[in-house]
């Protein structure tokens, strides 16, 4: 049985600023604890990046102080997408990469993500070591052994060149008009340059971060602005990233959303690589599974969370996986979810096939799916609640085997997510309504 973790969630540590570990004094100690673990493993250099939220500067300073107190050298990247930190950690031969971000969450949240020297999410074992070190009293190394900090000035340029190198189109993007929504986040100074330098005409929105507006009515979790702009600009398609750049969603020329499931379908069926199977999650649409099956491609489902998709891919020796929400893994190109790189793979397929995004998505028909989030006081007992178990069973029986229900707790927010999928929208609307009411009764 796995040992429970005290601080780490499904994607690092995350909370509202000023709550839990997301306070300057505690982040300083977290930096020290992580530094202590790094030193215990005989290593001594970390790289720190962040998204654009206002609290990032405060936590960057706190982490820097903690690592230096532990005798670990620090390289500061400034605002940089999460996947860029993973990539640069490898190319600079750092021993770990740290990202200060709450991903798609609002500005009042923040968090810490951790990468190994190989640019991969750290293991459960290392997370347990960090938690154990955090419980110890902080002690500072001698003055002569303190770590040193420096800023890396050419990081953005290095990452832009890497992204461009993953593009496999037979020709440049001259003639394409693309709208990019950078979510007022970490891709704001990266993504437009990548696509412009590949030859596209770029209309960029969400590129004026002020520390507060990250993910606010924009980006991969709120596509309305992008959809309207793609249609108004008569663009070929649009691409949206989330606040830290590890998610991607797309919009076709008609303004219709192309989500993570459809992106995975396009990648799996459009690549020249031999694809035996791909990894999705419990949330992946039944339409994806059916469409892939017709192509002889297996879909393996995991728990929700890109780390679980990654684990499945490593276990199977496969390279493609995705969550519906837009975490897309292309392990033939990167070590972690990378919104810019994933989008470039789709664009490569468009260019090489001569097909539009609308045409590429047509091989997959999505089942109607409704996902509703319920903010709750506590998620305790969700998996053992008898009333909820019976309600789920009754709901699936009413749908006659042509639908499914998934109720799960968010790993990063005080939410219970209710998802119902089936071949009739009116039916699933009715089922969602009754299940949400029950969740509110039992947990609010």
Curated annotation (Swiss-Prot):
EC category: isomerase
Enzyme Commission code(s) on record: 5.4.2.10
Catalytic activity: alpha-D-glucosamine 1-phosphate = D-glucosamine 6-phosphate
Cofactor annotation: Mg(2+)
One function term, GO molecular function aspect: phosphoglucosamine mutase activity
Residues recorded with modification Phosphoserine: 103
Annotated signal sequence range: none
The protein, known as: Phosphoglucosamine mutase
Record organism: Hydrogenovibrio crunogenus (strain DSM 25203 / XCL-2) (Thiomicrospira crunogena)
GO BP term, pick one: peptidoglycan biosynthetic process
Reported modifications of this chain: Activated by phosphorylation.
Active site, per annotation: 103
Keywords: Isomerase, Magnesium, Metal-binding, Phosphoprotein
Family: Belongs to the phosphohexose mutase family.
CDD domains: GlmM (cd05802)
Source organism superkingdom: Bacteria
UniProt-listed PANTHER family: PHOSPHOGLUCOMUTASE (ALPHA-D-GLUCOSE-1,6-BISPHOSPHATE-DEPENDENT), PHOSPHOHEXOSE MUTASE
Cofactor note: Binds 1 Mg(2+) ion per subunit.
Alphabetical list of PROSITE patterns matching this protein: PGM_PMM
Residues the record lists as binding Mg(2+): 103, 242, 244, 246
GO cellular component: cytosol
Function: Catalyzes the conversion of glucosamine-6-phosphate to glucosamine-1-phosphate.
């Amino acid at each position: 049985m796995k040992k429970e973790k005290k601080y780490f969630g499904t994607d690092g540590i995350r909370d509202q600023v000023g709550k839990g570990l997301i306070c300057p004094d505690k982040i300083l100690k977290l930096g020290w604890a992580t530094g202590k673990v790094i030193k215990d493993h005989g290593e001594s250099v970390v790289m720190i990046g962040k998204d654009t939220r206002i609290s990032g500067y405060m936590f960057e300073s706190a982490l820097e102080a903690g690592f230096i107190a532990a005798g670990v050298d620090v390289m500061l990247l400034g605002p940089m997408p999460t996947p860029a930190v993973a990539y640069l950690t490898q190319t600079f031969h750092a021993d770990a990469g740290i990202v200060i971000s709450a991903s798609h969450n609002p500005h009042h949240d923040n968090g810490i993500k951790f990468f190994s020297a190989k640019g991969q999410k750290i293991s459960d074992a290392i997370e347990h070591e960090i938690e154990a070190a955090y419980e110890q009293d902080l002690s500072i190394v001698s003055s002569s052994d303190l770590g040193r900090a420096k800023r890396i000035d050419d990081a953005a340029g290095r990452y832009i060149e890497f992204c461009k190198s993953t593009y496999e189109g037979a020709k440049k993007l001259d003639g394409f008009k693309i709208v990019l929504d950078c979510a007022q986040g970490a891709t704001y100074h990266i993504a437009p340059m990548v696509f412009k330098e590949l030859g596209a005409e770029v209309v960029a929105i969400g590129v004026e971060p002020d520390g507060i507006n990250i993910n606010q009515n924009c980006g991969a979790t709120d596509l309305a602005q992008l959809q309207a702009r793609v249609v108004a600009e008569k663009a070929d398609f649009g691409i949206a990233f989330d606040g830290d750049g590890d998610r991607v969603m797309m919009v076709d020329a008609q303004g219709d959303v192309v989500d993570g499931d459809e992106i995975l379908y396009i990648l799996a069926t459009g690549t020249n690589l031999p694809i035996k199977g791909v990894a999705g999650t419990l949330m992946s649409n039944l339409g994806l599974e059916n469409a892939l099956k017709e192509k002889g491609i297996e879909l393996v489902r995991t728990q929700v969370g890109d780390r679980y998709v990654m684990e499945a891919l490593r276990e199977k020796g496969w390279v493609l996986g995705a969550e519906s929400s837009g975490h897309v893994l292309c392990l033939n190109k990167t070590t972690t979810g990378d919104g810019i790189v994933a989008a470039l793979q789709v664009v490569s397929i468009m260019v090489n096939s001569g097909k539009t995004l609308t045409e590429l998505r047509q091989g997959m028909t999505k089942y109607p799916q409704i996902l509703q989030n319920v903010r709750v006081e506590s998620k305790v007992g969700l998996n053992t609640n008898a009333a909820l178990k019976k309600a789920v069973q009754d709901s699936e029986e009413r749908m006659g085997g042509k639908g499914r229900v998934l109720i799960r707790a968010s790993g990063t927010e005080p939410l219970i997510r209710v998802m119902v999928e089936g071949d009739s929208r009116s039916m699933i609307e009715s089922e969602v309504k009754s299940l949400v009411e029950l969740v509110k009764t039992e947990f609010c």
